[in-house]
């Protein structure tokens, strides 16, 4: 079952790369709701299809988790392209701040009440994990590692106030739909 879910995403990698390109990004940007061809099936009026980017990291994390459980290096070699392309997406999706850190701007996180937010904690943490997993996979396979993967994974911002992870930059206790920081 798990492999068939991963095969579904891998078989539609070209469409994810096309979606990233349409939005001006590199790599692969997986749809929030994918149809059978890999096209975005979310209605255009729903911002989740356009802005809920953490699904791309979720896909990459699932690929790495499958490898860690199976230790199937042949499978990993064949599917490394998914980890690489999603890492390339995140590197192209971030913006560099004046202090040298990185941010991901204008997203919807798992908390779908919070739209057009910057540095959503779940999105950023998932992107960090996806980048680190791409590095681990590349190391395992002796594949080249883009130095930007490491730089972004180490400097992507997660906002905290008084030791508490904030849902997103500027979060001040607004009502939430899903407590996405609990997913970290």
Whereabouts are the PLM-identified features?
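Aromatic- and histidine-enriched alpha-helix N-cap/loop-to-helix transition segments
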Residues: 1, 50-61, 78-81, 119-129, ...
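Carbohydrate-binding/catalytic loop surfaces
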Residues: 23-49, 101-122, 164-176
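A structural signal for alpha-helical segments
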Residues: 70-78, 115-118, 122, 144, ...
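Short linear motifs at secondary-structure transitions and domain/linker junctions
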Residues: 35, 80-83, 160-163
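Acidic/histidine-rich catalytic neighborhood
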Residues: 85, 89-141
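Active-site core of glycosidic bond-cleaving carbohydrate-active enzymes
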Residues: 1-12, 56-61, 65, 132, ...
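Helix-terminus loop motifs that line ligand-binding clefts
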Residues: 2-61, 67-77, 86, 91-101
């Amino acid at each position: 079952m798990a492999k068939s879910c991963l095969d579904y995403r891998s078989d539609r990698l070209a469409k994810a790369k096309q979606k990233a390109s349409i939005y001006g990004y590199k790599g692969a940007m997986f749809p929030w709701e994918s149809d059978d061809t890999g096209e975005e099936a979310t209605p255009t009026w729903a911002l989740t299809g356009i802005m809920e980017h953490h699904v791309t990291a979720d896909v990459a994390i699932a690929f790495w988790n499958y490898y860690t459980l199976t230790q199937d290096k042949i499978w990993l070699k064949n599917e490394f392209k998914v980890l690489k392309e999603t890492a390339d997406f995140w590197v192209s999706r971030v913006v560099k701040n004046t202090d040298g850190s990185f941010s991901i701007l204008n997203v919807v996180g798992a908390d779908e009440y919070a739209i057009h937010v910057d540095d959503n904690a779940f999105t950023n943490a998932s992107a960090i994990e996806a980048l680190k997993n791409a590095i681990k996979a590349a190391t395992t396979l002796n594949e080249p590692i883009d130095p930007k993967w490491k730089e972004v994974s180490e400097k992507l911002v997660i906002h905290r106030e008084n030791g508490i992870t904030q849902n997103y930059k500027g979060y001040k206790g607004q009502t939430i739909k899903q407590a996405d920081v609990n997913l970290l």
